[in-house]
Amino acid sequence: MYAIIETGGKQLCVREGDTVRVEKLAVEDGAEVVFDRVLLVSTEEGLKIGRPLVLGARVTGRVQKQGRARKIIVFKYKAKKNYRRKQGHRQPYTQVVIEKIEL
């Protein structure tokens, strides 16, 4: 059984027991989080496709940790003008373990 959920402006395919990184959520470590924006659920009977969401479907997970991704470097410059700007960025994320998919 798997589901496709929407969180943080992204769509993720999840199964029970999966560990996924989502955009930062304002919850504590160990807290339960519920994703109710479920776009598709696959069961033994077949696919349930939402238009746009599957009614009554929920995906429950537990927050494992909050973290920050690897640093990326943004470097802008203009040729022959001595204009250079270097900036780093680390995107915050929340790591979630998927516990249950309900329909």
UniProtKB/Swiss-Prot annotation:
One GO term of the cellular component aspect? ribonucleoprotein complex
In the record, what terms sit under GO molecular function? rRNA binding; structural constituent of ribosome
GO terms for biological process, alphabetical:
translation
Alphabetical keyword list: Ribonucleoprotein, Ribosomal protein, RNA-binding, rRNA-binding
| Top-rank lineage group of the source organism | Bacteria
Alphabetized InterPro entries for the sequence? bL21-like, bL21-like_sf, Ribosomal_bL21, Ribosomal_bL21_CS
Report whether Ribonucleoprotein shows up as a keyword of the record.
yes
Q: Which family does it belong to?
A: Belongs to the bacterial ribosomal protein bL21 family.
**Assembly state and interactors?**
Part of the 50S ribosomal subunit. Contacts protein L20.
Concerning NCBIfam families, the annotation shows: L21
Q: Which PANTHER family match?
A: 50S RIBOSOMAL PROTEIN L21, LARGE RIBOSOMAL SUBUNIT PROTEIN BL21M
Q: What is this protein called?
A: Large ribosomal subunit protein bL21
Source organism per entry reads: Desulforudis audaxviator (strain MP104C)
Gene, per the UniProt record: rplU
